[in-house]
Amino acid sequence: MFHTPHPAISLLFAFGLIILVLMPLLAWFLLHGHHDKKSQLWFAGAALYAGTALLFAFQYRLPSFLAFTTGSALSVLFYFFTRASMQAELEDTQTPWREYVYLTLLFVLISSSLDWLNLRKTWGLLFNSVIFSWLALINCRLCLRVQRQYQSRGCFVLVCMFGTFSVLHAIRAGLTVFGSHGVALLDFELFSNIFLVCIFLAAICSS
C-alpha cells in the first residue's frame, strides 16, 4: 500500500493515519451538540492536517501536484484554522479569512512554480520548511498565551506540538542550506526517521 522498505513500516504508517483521522472524528461525535465556533475551527484544522497526512502517505501513487503542492497548502490552512480557533479563545475579533485565502493562494503559486522548475527538492523544500517553521512558531506563541490565561494542560501539550513542528522545520531548512541535500521524509535514513517519528508523535498529541 505504501512505498516503504519494510511491511512493518507500512503498518506504522497505517496506524499513524488511523489515529490522525479517527481521533478527531471520535472527539467530534462525542462532543456532538456542544460545538461552538472555536471547536469547529479547531476540528476543521485537524481535518485539513489529516488530509495532508493522507496525501503524504500516498505520494508515490498520486500526481506530484496533488501529493506535494495540495498537501502543503492543506498544511498552511491547518495553521490558519488552528490560529483562528486560538485567537477566538483570547478575544472576540473577526478572523481575517480574506488575508488567509490570499496568503494560501500565494503559497500555492510559489510552490507550484518551484515544482514546475524542478526545484522542489532544493528551493521548494527550503521554502516549505521556512514557511511551516514560521507558521508553527506563531501558533506556538499564541497557544502559550491561551495556556497562560486558562492554565490548561491540554494547551501545554499543544505548545509542545507547535514548538516541535517549528524546530523540526527550522532544522530541515538549515540542513537544506548547509547540508548536501534536504531531508526527504521518506528516505528512511537517520535524520528522516527521527523527523518522521517526531512529526507523527506531535500530530497525534494534537488529535
Model-found features: residue ranges?
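Signal-transducing coiled-coil linker helices
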Residues: V197-S207
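Short aromatic-rich membrane-water interface segments that cap or initiate transmembrane helices
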Residues: H3-S10, F188-V197
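Juxtamembrane segments at transmembrane-helix boundaries
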Residues: L20-S39, A53-N193, F200
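Hydrophobic transmembrane alpha-helical segments in integral membrane proteins
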Residues: M1-V21
